Amino acid sequence: MKNISFICLFLLLGVACQESNAPKSPVRESKTNISVPPNFGDYWYQGNAELSSYTLEQVRYGAVHDGTAVLVFVTEPFSKSRQVKIDRPEGGKDELTVLKLNKTKSFITGIYPYQLMNSTFSPVEIGDYPKALKSATTVQEWCGHVYSQYNLREKGYQWRSFSYFESEGDQEKNLAEPWLEDGIWNQIRLNPESLPVGDFEMVPSSFLPG
């Protein structure tokens, strides 16, 4: 990889991930007239992932730290009710195809490392489901770690966060239905015309700002 900031290297690789358990809950549909381009499957339905690698300059504790950032995009079958990857050959009416983004940041502050990862799942059927169904973030460093997750339910997003730090602790909130900044990366890949315009509410990224 060339050490040039914000120049990405695209690779193709096969990806396989395991399913995990998640609570069941209905998801509300929101109809629009926007869809993915007709040739979407020529690139995204070939059983491969798109990997983009970046050099990173991360601000933390009042200083700029060098590191690496990686974006991995891939399509996969997804359960609407459980909001996990479907491993069954036929998922039936519960199955949606999503564009998943796994993004990571790795950098060192002083003597100890930071590892961050976010996974965001956006339905390819953006005409029926214009917003991300799920977004989960983990932050690990030597003091402790934090995990947070958004799930789109019938009445909006359910947000849960679990933290090592007393000031954050375990939290749970319900949000009407804002846009998630972490979902914008997928919106651009699916169809830039699906991006929100005008006045709207957006939840900032769960990642540390760059």
Please report, for each region that a protein language model flagged, where it lies by residue.
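Sec-dependent signal peptide recognition
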Residues: 2-8
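C-terminal motif of bacterial Sec signal peptides marking the signal peptidase cleavage site
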Residues: 15-16
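Bacterial Sec signal peptide processing site at the extreme N-terminus
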Residues: 19-29
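Contiguous hydrophobic, core-forming segments of folded domains
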Residues: 28-60, 72-73, 96-209
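An N-terminal, globular interaction/scaffold subdomain
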Residues: 65-78, 86
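Charged, amphipathic alpha-helical segments
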Residues: 80-86, 98-99
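A glycine-rich, acidic short-motif signal
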Residues: 89-95
